[in-house]
């Protein structure tokens, strides 16, 4: 599935038209996660659909969802901008950024400098770079470009060998462990436990996907995660405020 998405991205990049730059201040994604509202930082995801689950939220108003997340004390937001596979839009991110005061991560499949520039222009405070989608040297180049523009970067891996190859090139500030295998789309929070021991000191560790309960939060926190990225389990609820409070057992 990842290979199919990357091929689609390569086609899309050929026709990118860069928008005007969104004139909203940059916010520190990293600092928000370093100073969370609860025992573990929460990146709450604004997501309409996914390839594995199909349509997740039929009545989808990104600004309302984002405002609910902020009211429930999420620390940062993630917005899906991929159109073909996740029914996202770049405009969703810009709209969310203009609605809330939280830092916003652009969740997409970024493989080219043009997408980094596009992310900056639509207002992203941080971008996602996927270890399984790029050679470590390519990932490092895009990482540096994003940092030079004042954006944070969440470097995501699923597999320990991918992490080891990246660490031979550089050490990211923020490292995400994707508990979902992007080849099979199966999830297991034990993936965080498995890979966390390889994460160097000084990396802010984020556990992503498959997190749906207080027990999951406590498990990944115990194994070194300082923050989590949660999407589907929050988006499926009628009230995103209640969903966050339920996740934390409040």
Curated annotation (Swiss-Prot):
InterPro entries: Aldolase_TIM, Indole-3-glycerol_P_synth, Indole-3-glycerol_P_synth_dom, Indole-3-GlycerolPSynthase_CS, RibuloseP-bd_barrel. Pathway: Amino-acid biosynthesis; L-tryptophan biosynthesis; L-tryptophan from chorismate: step 4/5. Its EC number is 4.1.1.48. It catalyses: 1-(2-carboxyphenylamino)-1-deoxy-D-ribulose 5-phosphate + H(+) = (1S,2R)-1-C-(indol-3-yl)glycerol 3-phosphate + CO2 + H2O. GO terms for molecular function: indole-3-glycerol-phosphate synthase activity; phosphoribosylanthranilate isomerase activity. It is an enzyme of class 4 (lyase). PROSITE patterns: IGPS. It holds the Pfam family IGPS. Keywords: Amino-acid biosynthesis, Aromatic amino acid biosynthesis, Decarboxylase, Lyase, Tryptophan biosynthesis. GO terms for biological process: L-tryptophan biosynthetic process. Belongs to the TrpC family. This is Indole-3-glycerol phosphate synthase. It comes from Bacillus velezensis (strain DSM 23117 / BGSC 10A6 / LMG 26770 / FZB42) (Bacillus amyloliquefaciens subsp. plantarum). The gene is trpC.
